[in-house]
C-alpha cells in the first residue's frame, strides 16, 4: 500500500512540515542560519531543501553548496488553534523582505517524518531526491553528491490523520 501526498488536501493556508525523529545536526553543530534566501524564493516550508551556497552568500536551489533541510523555529501564537501545518516562512512577512532560514545539514542515517514531498504516491523502498524547487520527489536523477533519502515507513504526521512518510538519509 502506498501513501498519497497531495498538497491540495492540506487545506487552505496549510503547509507541509517535518517531525524530527533523529536528526544529528543539533548535536554535531550543523545548524546554520547565516545566509538569506535568494530573491526569487518567496516561501520556505519546513522540510524544503536548499543549497547552502556560501560563495554567493545565499541559500538557493541551484548553487554549489550542499543540500540542507529548512527547519525553522515555528512562530505559532495560539497552540489551541494552530498546528505545525500553520507555519511557513514568507518573504513578505520578514523585515525588509529578507528571509534567513535555519537549515540543518544532513548525514546518512538521519531520520525524519514529513509530508513535504511532491504530489504522488510513495511506498517503502522508494528513493527521493530534492527537485528543482527543493521539494523531495521520486524518480529524479541521482548524481554523485546528491542528497538521497529512502522511504522507510508509510505513516501519518503527528496530527494522526495527514498522510506522511518516514525517511532515512542514505547519502548527503
Model regions and ranges:
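Surface-exposed, low-hydrophobicity beta-strand/loop segments enriched in small/polar/acidic residues
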Residues: 1-172
Amino acid at each position: 500500500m502506498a501513501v498519497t501526498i497531495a498538497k491540495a488536501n492540506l487545506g487552505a493556508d496549510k503547509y507541509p512540515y517535518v517531525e524530527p525523529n533523529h536528526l544529528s545536526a543539533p548535536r554535531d553543530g550543523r545548524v546554520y542560519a547565516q545566509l538569506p534566501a535568494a530573491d526569487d524564493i518567496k516561501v520556505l516550508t519546513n522540510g524544503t531543501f536548499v543549497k547552502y551556497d556560501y560563495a554567493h552568500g545565499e541559500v538557493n536551489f541551484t548553487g554549489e553548496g550542499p543540500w540542507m533541510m529548512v527547519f525553522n523555529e515555528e512562530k505559532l501564537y495560539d497552540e489551541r488553534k494552530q498546528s505545525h501545518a500553520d507555519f511557513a516562512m514568507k518573504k513578505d512577512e520578514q523585515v525588509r523582505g529578507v528571509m534567513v532560514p535555519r537549515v540543518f545539514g544532513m548525514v546518512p542515517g538521519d531520520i525524519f517524518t514529513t509530508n513535504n514531498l511532491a504530489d504522488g504516491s510513495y511506498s517503502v523502498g522508494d528513493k527521493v531526491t530534492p527537485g528543482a524547487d527543493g521539494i523531495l520527489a521520486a524518480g529524479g536523477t541521482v548524481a554523485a553528491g546528491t542528497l538521497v533519502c529512502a522511504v522507510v515507513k508509510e505513516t501519518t504526521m503527528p496530527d494522526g490523520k495527514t498522510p506522511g512518510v518516514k525517511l532515512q538519509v542514505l547519502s548527503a
